[in-house]
Amino acid sequence: MLVWLCGLCLVTLAGGRSAARLPLTEGRPTADFLPGDASLVEELLFGTGDTIELSCTTPGSSVSVVWFKDGISVDPPTWSHTGQKLLKIINVSYDDSGVYSCKARQSSEVLRNVTVRVTDSPSSGDDEDDDEESESANAPKFTRPEWMEKKLLAVPAANTVRFRCPAAGKPTPSITWLKNGKEFKGEHRIGGIKLRHQQWSLVMESVVPSDRGNYTCVVANKYGTIRETYTLDVLERTPHRPILQAGFRSNKTVVVGSDVEFHCKVYSDAQPHIQWLKHVEVNGSKFGPDGNPYVTVLKTAGVNTSDKELEIQFLRNVTFEDAGEYTCLAGNSIGYSHHSAWLTVLPPAEPVPDVDTSVSILAAAGCVAVVILVVIIIFTYKMKMPSKKTMNTATVHKVSKFPLKRQVSLESNSSMNSNTPLVRITRLSSSDGPMLANVSELELPADPKWELSRSRLTLGKPLGEGCFGQVVMADAVGIEKDKPNKATSVAVKMLKDDATDKDLSDLVSEMEMMKMIGKHKNIINLLGACTQDGPLYVLVEYASKGNLREYLRARRPPGMDYSFDTCKLPEEQLTFKDLVSCAYQVARGMEYLASQKCIHRDLAARNVLVTDDNVMKIADFGLARDVHNIDYYKKTTNGRLPVKWMAPEALFDRVYTHQSDVWSFGVLLWEIFTLGGSPYPGIPVEELFKLLKEGHRMDKPANCTHELYMIMRECWHAVPSQRPTFKQLVEDLDRVLTVTSTDEYLDLSVPFEQYSPACPDSHSSCSSGDDSVFAHDLPEEPCLPKHQQYNGVIRT
């Protein structure tokens, strides 16, 4: 039972356990515990199935009381009153959690407030076990209070909001979210909520004015409870017609009898009206006299239809009559939006007729005979090869064969062993030194799928070079197999005459890596190779607009603080949507590389190339990089190291994962929205190490929304596992791209000079910054100014 004795609150549970205890003061109760003072709210934690007894102390013994739960008078049959001053709750459950208060029946004065929280029942045990557990156990505490300093958050409608309460305790505490004092699970919120318990966060996408209020996180275990409250204010947006998420226009082709789903995600400040329509023909015509199409309504809003149900159109066991055009139509008081997709229904595949057994036996025997004949021919040919080779290379003093080992970033569970020889190269040279005196004397096995005759390749102007390799523009005839006479502009990677065996190994390794990765729109794809009768040429896609960093800098709007050429107008003015599109395309490319188990390790704007039609393509993902023998504090002869793009675990522990690539992607986002700015401008490398360890991060760029900056900060999470995946980044950026206006130009008053390096870039004669294709070390060391210049771009 529960009794009040001089300030002592002892709640007795079934079995005689004490759930919570308040301090006891000898003699008279202190002012904090006077019966008439309800300013103190006791918090009590119970397990499911317990029995709770709550008492209410009154000024006089004859005063009767009334009990309330969350402000509502309660008296269910499972509860009992003893003189109405003792409330007993039997076999408690989660629903019994809440704020209990008692009032004098003839008065509105609250005599007592008690918050009851019900969690999973702790395992029972003897007193000794409890004592041992209590020695190592502790109450919850917030682990990152600096993340919780901003208590008031004001955002425009349709943005994404995240509240975080990172905490720790033993046993691991639970977290519950309240909105305006009541438990909040988002059941009645359009779009719902995301509760990420591993990140101790509450996420609400596409917020609307009705989301305003106070949000409280309650973190508790059986040793204590802590809470923190945030205030959210949602600013009204300009009304607009419904916005339909990109991606619906995906035509479907299925076999008759299959099930089909069409999805239509709708964003609207005003309540939208959603309909699914199927286009039909009337008297052989698809359109009426007024020019509008004939349609039949498949699904529309109803009393018992939820928004989520309306966003999906199911077609069960489709027939040929179901084929045709389907449209999702969404409207509100401002206007209408619609997307359409086609459904094609195919007949089932005809079963293969049974073949006579004797015919099968004869066919099998014929195949075996052909295989045996081919083996004999190959064996005979191999036997004759040594004598021919000896005759052709009689003047060679030394023949050296070495296997090329993969040095690319593939995860250990890849289907290819990282030490598997990919290509065996015969080096024919009269020199015993380590240099290749004549690259043309190398012999590589031809790959028919990729081999291109040198006669069909016309080399053009140089595009860039490094210490050991160079890239030139060229015209290749016959790259497109279906157009054998068409010339295509390509970029050709090749070695210099003084390249070493390792340089050749790296270039061949990159070529083989690109073969294995496959093709994607947002990566630089392999087009072919010249491996016979001359030096090794690797043909890749040509990006006419150069790398993304210089592309953005060339398009900075002119202004009084423009630090480059104030007399030169930018080639074209970028909109905010253009920048989001750049980020989205790079995320798509990285999502594909991650799906192929490829870790880039040097993702930055300088390693993203831009084609003539503004397609972003990730480059240098197949490079061999020695990440274990680099001194990050020293400049090497191969250029500068990219410490400003590296995740802390890669920088300090040499650990490279997809999560470290996500960190680099966050820095690349910052580069995009500063139009090619240099990260951490004016921060010396030694100071940068210290700032990163202390949790400091770059501030929000001027032309970046709060939502996109939150994506950057998520990429820069100190714990790699709590950073978003590239798949999640693609989804987030797709949503941002969908709701972004196409005519939202950048703020011309922003001084982009603040994002420029504090000292000029200094390239060595062998800098790999321009030609990282042949770099053995990672390119680009941060610029080291003489004086620290923070420029207000570092924040905690």
UniProtKB/Swiss-Prot annotation:
| Gene Ontology biological process terms from the UniProt entry | apoptotic process; positive regulation of cell population proliferation; positive regulation of MAPK cascade
Glycosylated residue positions: 91, 113, 214, 251, 283, 304, 317
Q: Which residues bind ATP?
A: 463-471, 493
Query: Which reaction equation describes what this protein catalyses?
Result: L-tyrosyl-[protein] + ATP = O-phospho-L-tyrosyl-[protein] + ADP + H(+)
Q: Which InterPro entries match?
A: FGF_rcpt_fam (IPR016248), Ig-like_dom (IPR007110), Ig-like_dom_sf (IPR036179), Ig-like_fold (IPR013783), Ig_I-set (IPR013098), Ig_sub (IPR003599), Ig_sub2 (IPR003598), Kinase-like_dom_sf (IPR011009)
A molecular function (GO) term: fibroblast growth factor receptor activity
- Record note on domains: The second and third Ig-like domains directly interact with fibroblast growth factors (FGF) and heparan sulfate proteoglycans.
Instruction: Work out whether the entry's keyword set contains Amino-acid biosynthesis.
Output: no
Leader sequence range is 1-19
Provide the membrane topology annotation: Single-pass type I membrane protein
Give the record's PTM text: Autophosphorylated. Binding of FGF family members together with heparan sulfate proteoglycan or heparin promotes receptor dimerization and autophosphorylation on tyrosine residues. Autophosphorylation occurs in trans between the two FGFR molecules present in the dimer.
* Annotated protein name in UniProt: Fibroblast growth factor receptor 3
Question: Cellular component GO terms, alphabetically?
Answer: plasma membrane; receptor complex
Active-site residue list: 602 (proton acceptor)
Tissues of expression: Undetectable in the adult skeletal muscle. Low levels of expression were detected in the liver, lung and kidney. Medium levels of expression were detected in the heart, spleen, intestine and eye. Highest expression is observed in the testis.
Q: Spell out which residues lie on the membrane's Extracellular side.
A: 20-358
State the compartments where it is located: Cell membrane
The Ig-like C2-type domain covers: 21-119, 140-233, 239-344
Q: Which residues lie on this side of the membrane: Cytoplasmic?
A: 380-796
Characterize the regulation of its activity.
Present in an inactive conformation in the absence of bound ligand. Ligand binding leads to dimerization and activation by autophosphorylation on tyrosine residues.
The function of this protein is:
Tyrosine-protein kinase that acts as a cell-surface receptor for fibroblast growth factors and plays an essential role in the regulation of cell proliferation, differentiation and apoptosis. Plays an essential role in the regulation of chondrocyte differentiation, proliferation and apoptosis, and is required for normal skeleton development. Regulates both osteogenesis and postnatal bone mineralization by osteoblasts. Promotes apoptosis in chondrocytes, but can also promote cancer cell proliferation. Phosphorylates PLCG1, CBL and FRS2.
